[in-house]
């Protein structure tokens, strides 16, 4: 049987994403996710929090980094990677998750942030971005507007929420 290195996590961002560039010009997005775990200890429930460092390379990381805001719920898919280095004569190592896909599942306040098909993923964002602008997002907002609003308000991919007509619509149908 072949070895398997596959990780899937759902948690909340502990801080805003950090976007850096390598000397060769490659984008590197770093962020951390907290995952709560409840377990029974005798008659009581004990909550434990685990923290995981995540990296997302390339165009996907570059584009989605602006939406990775502290408190947002995300799903991360990737693999474990171990970095090793020497520091002051001591061998050091760190295990982090190298993400292949990141999906925004909810806002800081718990509402869903969705795009066309109900998901807002890093691979979809990278494919749909043109000239630094992400389809289905407002130019002045860090949250996706999505086609849920766009279809009902007459918005297209280059519109912002400021251009929408909210006067005669039932806003209770918006899922966030």
Swiss-Prot record:
Gene3D superfamilies: Nucleic acid-binding proteins. Transmembrane segments: none annotated. InterPro entries: NA-bd_OB-fold, Primosome_PriB/ssb, ssDNA-bd. This is Single-stranded DNA-binding protein. It comes from Treponema pallidum (strain Nichols). It comes from the Bacteria. HAMAP family: SSB. The keyword Cell division does not apply. Homotetramer. Keywords: DNA-binding. Residues 157-176 have a biased composition (Polar residues). GO terms for cellular component: nucleoid. GO terms for molecular function: single-stranded DNA binding. Residues 118-176 are annotated as: Disordered.
